[in-house]
């Protein structure tokens, strides 16, 4: 057991902090557009519906190029492909400062999705290549921690950058895009020099440790009936993969609907400066961090993914409804904090599921498809809320819509359990000799 702990601790120390930093940069980048919208719309003529459409177009580009990107990652290796992703997404984010109107906004948001496609599922794929199944819940929780941390940082940071309005004849939102895009460009070279492609190429594990880790991954393939398709594209037709892609939709639709509109929701509480809005926007994400520190470890300890997911969806749906129904800004913010607790921790738990039945290049293709289809929710959520806000004049209808979406996720939890886990258990029982 001490040997196993040493190996997992070493791998985690060498990989996870740097991957968390990279995803932190990516998620701050994604959050920037929500804060830029507070002023950009008036400067270049982008209304609520146009903003919702443009914010969502990122995910159309992401959807179309996710699977090809992850297959190229498997072909060229994580080191080269992650370097490419960082360079292109950083440069395109900085180019967002040049937006002149809705058309250029739409184009650059779409291109940003194309550029970033493959990063998040690429990291998930790496986790399946480095960690046995029994350790993935905790590790996934550690990695997904970068999401709420990024949102917590993004609020105050955006408030400060928006305050630079007029410096060097640039608007504050232009400074915001330049500032959040630059770190990705600067991290490209260190990533190329540091990130290993596979277990065999690292020098920080002994031969004995490498062999143990590879043996454990092989054991997982047998124990969890993992599939390694002869052609990785066949994973795209696997019914289990398609079901999980559908199951991921409620998570992404809710989380991006909330993330990209939260500054506007906070502003409707009663105004306030950009810095005040930024700091208030960070509060729900503190609870997202708490959820990620508690829930994934609990799922590993109890070996119960679906019970936890059911609880999170049910609680999140109730809290989302209350955030639109309540009139007190304090209570609304408290309800949104509960929503963040549920959404971020459910994301970490969800991503332990595909690796239970996919491995190798099939995992790269399958995870990419799940993420790309699921991330269509990132298009529907912001766009749908934008339309509802423009029609009703407030955010309540959009929050009720997200509450219904989370109830749909609760229903899907039972369907996924019945189709994947219970069916597998019955098969195992039938195969046991009498």
Curated annotation (Swiss-Prot):
Regions that span the bilayer: 15-35, 45-65, 85-105, 110-130, 142-162, 175-195, 241-261, 275-295, 306-326, 333-353, 367-387, 396-416
Keywords: Antibiotic resistance, Cell inner membrane, Cell membrane, Membrane, Transmembrane, Transmembrane helix, Transport
Membrane topology: Multi-pass membrane protein
UniProt-listed Pfam families: MFS_1
Keyword Cell membrane: yes
GO terms classed as biological process: response to antibiotic
Gene3D superfamilies reported in the protein's UniProt record: MFS general substrate transporter like domains
InterPro entries: MFS (IPR011701), MFS_dom (IPR020846), MFS_trans_sf (IPR036259)
Record GO terms (molecular function): transmembrane transporter activity
Signal peptide, first to last residue: none
Subcellular location, principal: membrane
Record's GO cellular component terms: plasma membrane
Disrupted-gene phenotype: Inactivation of the gene causes a significant reduction in the surface-associated motility and virulence. Mutant has 2- to 4-fold higher susceptibility to novobiocin and trimethoprim, and 8- to 32-fold higher susceptibility to the quinolone-type antibiotics nalidixic acid, levofloxacin and ciprofloxacin. Mutation does not affect susceptibility to beta-lactams, aminoglycosides, macrolides and polymyxins.
Compartments, record wording: Cell inner membrane
Family: Belongs to the major facilitator superfamily.
Function summary: Efflux pump that mediates resistance to quinolone-type antibiotics.
Protein name in the entry: Quinolone resistance transporter
Record organism: Acinetobacter baumannii
């Amino acid at each position: 057991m001490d040997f196993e702990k040493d190996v997992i601790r070493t791998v985690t120390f060498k990989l996870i902090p740097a991957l968390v930093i990279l995803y932190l940069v990516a998620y701050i980048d994604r959050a920037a557009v929500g804060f830029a919208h507070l002023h950009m719309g008036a400067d270049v003529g982008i209304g609520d519906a146009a903003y919702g459409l443009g914010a969502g177009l990122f995910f159309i580009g992401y959807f179309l190029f996710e699977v090809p990107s992850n297959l190229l990652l498997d072909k060229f290796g994580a080191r080269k492909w992650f370097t490419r992703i960082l360079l292109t997404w950083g440069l395109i984010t900085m180019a967002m400062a040049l937006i002149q109107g809705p058309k250029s906004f739409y184009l650059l948001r779409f291109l940003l999705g194309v550029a970033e496609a493959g990063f998040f599922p690429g990291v998930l794929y790496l986790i399946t290549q480095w960690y046995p199944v029994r350790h993935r819940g905790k590790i996934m929780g550690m990695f997904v921690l970068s999401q709420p941390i990024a949102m917590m940082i993004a609020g105050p940071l955006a408030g400060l950058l928006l305050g630079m309005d007029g410096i060097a004849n640039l608007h504050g939102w232009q400074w915001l895009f330049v500032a959040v895009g630059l770190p990705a460009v600067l991290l490209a070279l260190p990533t190329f020099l540091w990130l290993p492609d596979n277990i065999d190429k690292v020098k920080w594990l002994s031969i004995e440790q490498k062999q143990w880790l590879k043996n454990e991954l092989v054991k997982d393939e047998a124990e969890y009936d993992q599939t390694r398709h002869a052609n990785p594209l066949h994973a795209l037709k696997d019914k289990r993969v398609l079901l999980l892609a559908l199951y991921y939709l409620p998570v992404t639709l809710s989380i991006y609907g909330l993330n990209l509109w939260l500054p506007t929701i906070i502003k409707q509480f009663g105004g306030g400066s950009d810095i005040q809005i930024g700091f208030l926007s960070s509060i729900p994400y503190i609870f997202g961090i708490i959820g990620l520190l508690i829930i994934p470890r609990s799922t590993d300890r109890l070996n119960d993914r679906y019970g936890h997911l059911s609880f999170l969806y049910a609680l999140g749906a109730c809290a989302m409804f209350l955030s639109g129904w309540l009139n007190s800004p304090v209570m609304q913010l408290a309800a949104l904090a509960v929503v963040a607790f549920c959404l971020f921790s459910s994301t970490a738990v969800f991503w332990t599921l595909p690796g239970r039945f996919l491995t190798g290049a099939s995992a790269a293709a399958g995870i990419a498809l799940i993420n790309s289809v699921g991330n269509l929710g990132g298009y529907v959520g912001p766009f749908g809320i934008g339309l509802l806000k423009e029609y009703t004049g407030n955010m309540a209808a959009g929050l009720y819509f997200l509450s219904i979406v989370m109830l749909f996720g609760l229903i899907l939890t039972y369907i996924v359990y019945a189709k994947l886990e219970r069916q597998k258990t019955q098969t195992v029982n039938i195969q046991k000799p009498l």
